[in-house]
Design a protein with these regions (language model features):
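N-terminal Rossmann NAD(P)H-binding glycine-rich loop of SDR-like oxidoreductase domains
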Residues: 3-22
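Glycine-rich NAD(P)-binding loop of the Rossmann-fold in SDR/ketoreductase-type enzymes
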Residues: 35, 71-79, 118, 122, ...
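NAD(P)-dependent short-chain dehydrogenase/reductase
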Residues: 110, 133-186, 191, 226-228
Length: 256
């Protein structure tokens, strides 16, 4: 199997590349600017014919997206349209995996299935859903993976996990520990597990939308507390919202 991958230098991308290499697949990473269609054309032209393309390239941190929404749309939405346009022209038979997010949904007290209404909880979710729409409209052999709350030891700030690690190392934990969204509930999954799921999807090559998550609800305060043996005096700040996936559709596919 011959694989093309965008976003290979990111946390999930590096893990996927390692796993792809271990399985003996050939791959070619995209190292250009996804906003530049000629960079994508050059990449596809200079590579072997792709059986699979895994599209991870994106601006992800919600704070960065809020600060520069125009750039985020250019990368996450227009960049995706650029990719599918080139693939339609030069590799229309390949299977495309588009990495989206659980942020395309609104907060819900119930588990969120792929059939739930779309109402992005963040600007990041809005940019990724726009990418979904553009990809679905312009490419047939497409699988969209809506990844919920990813964490990994190699992440850097401003993501939650590395931010909390840094605070736990630097702050006096005998004092009150202020935490925005402490009462919010998320569906956390390690990037290693996410990469394994993507590889399983790659083996099946389904079309359609799949939630990629653990299916388990965890309060952010509990996730943070699990990172230290010190009993934290957590002070909750900000609003509460809930994003927990129903993963029945995913489990049914990968367990067939």
């Amino acid at each position: 199997m011959k694989i093309g991958i965008t976003g290979a230098s990111g946390v999930l991308g590096r893990i996927l590349v390692d796993k792809i290499s271990q399985q003996g697949y050939e791959y070619k990473s995209f190292e250009g600017d996804i906003r530049n269609i000629s960079d994508i054309q050059d990449w596809v032209d200079s590579s072997f014919p792709f059986d699979v393309v895994i599209h991870l390239a994106a601006i992800v941190p919600t704070s960065q997206v809020r600060e520069n929404l125009g750039q985020a749309f250019d990368v996450n939405s227009v960049g995706t349209k650029n990719l599918v346009d080139v693939l339609n022209e030069k590799a229309s038979n390949c299977w495309l995996f588009y990495s989206s997010t659980g942020h395309v949904y609104k907060s819900s007290n119930e588990e969120i299935s792929e059939e739930n209404d779309i109402e992005p909880i963040s600007e990041y979710g809005l940019t990724k859903y726009a990418g979904e729409v553009l990809a679905k409209k312009n490419f047939k052999n497409l699988c969209i993976g809506r990844i919920f709350s990813m964490y990994h030891d190699t992440q850097n700030p401003p993501f939650l996990y590395p931010n909390i690690k840094k605070r736990l190392e630097e702050e006096d934990l005998t004092k009150f520990f202020e935490l925005y969204g402490a009462e919010s509930v998320r569906d956390f999954l390690n990037a290693e597990d996410i990469a394994d799921i993507i590889l399983k999807l790659m083996g099946k090559k389904p079309q359609g939308v799949y939630n990629i998550a653990s299916g388990k609800a965890t309060k952010i305060r509990d996730f943070v507390q699990s990172m230290t043996e010190e009993k934290l005096k957590i002070v909750s700040l900000g609003n509460k919202d809930i994003l927990v996936a129903n993963i029945d559709k995913l489990n049914k596919l990968i367990n067939e």
